[in-house]
């Protein structure tokens, strides 16, 4: 029978990856049979077979739909169901925490290596979907910039969107970052998390959680979040928290989104940071100039050669960096320079904040302070220091922490649009024949003029290069001080008040 064989294969996968131990085989089989409302079972010979997890989960979810165990075959319902299956294979939090702490005692990097592998083995991070993401790099005056078209977040079909909209609203868990997600079954408007495990850590004297992002935008993309559902705030404590984590996991960087709309991330309601083990172009950016700040002569300070406006501070004692970061933040929050169109506030609404990123380089701690301002104007209603309308056909979303560091996370629609646009450019057919390409028309005409020899073999490379240059332009838009003589003079005026 197909069901028995697929259950046996799933359990064999658990054995091969260490999710299931031999003493738990029978128990695990019976737990899976219960989900399928199946009273019988016949032994299957699958020992040593190479198991492709996505295929097994697809087959089991198909059976569940055929049997009426799930009432819909859309992507959301299927994900809710196959996560339930993986929850059966996933050991309880206590076991994962114990294993992590044992390995951490030996070596923090080995502990995160093991936890990252586990988070993929149990399908919390869906390897098969992450592989679909399109990634490339482009050269820029600031170094090699990373571009991704994110295809790992599944597109919901209209039926699933309607079901999510009509689902009863619940305040549990309060958001997708809360501790209460661990083991939660999910619903049409909230993902299933039976296979989600959190490592508890102490940050600034309170209980925090450490987990990986299920969408891993870069290597070992982790999320470090407050045990309490409290809002994001960039202040003295935020800097303390960043370095508390870096001291525990010196092989990772950690950063925070800004705490104001437009320049912040998508979740401002829950205090959290994002980090990981990846070398972004920003980390390798050169110091454009070094400066000395009175009272902090022992701290190395410089302006970074980067499209956004970044002050980098370096010292072996992180406490000195926290003190200086406090000083810079306080001055920036209250800073106005009308000539540079920087206003600390208008009509009582604050505009200035910082996107901070901490890391350790050898024995030296480093903190990058990215100056942000969320003022809007009539010409730029979405934000003056935000992607301008000429770039919205590629990127109009907020420039958050990940983008600040030099990684574009672009919408999945671009994959299909680029394929269609490539066809039009090569065949020289009218772009306006395709409604979804009209927004790209001006840009496409510039590409045609720039590359008269565009053809089948070079068109995708050309489009990737030009998308990359659009993103560089987007980052330059987000910089409060432009990389021009005038912009740098204005930056110097701010440095002078420090």
Regions from the PLM with identified roles:
Residues 246-266, 275-327, 333-336:
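Catalytic or ion-translocation cores adjacent to nucleophile or general acid/base/metal-coordination motifs
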Residues 1-224, 228-231, 305-307, 321-325, ...:
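Active-site microenvironments that recognize anionic phosphate/pyrophosphate groups
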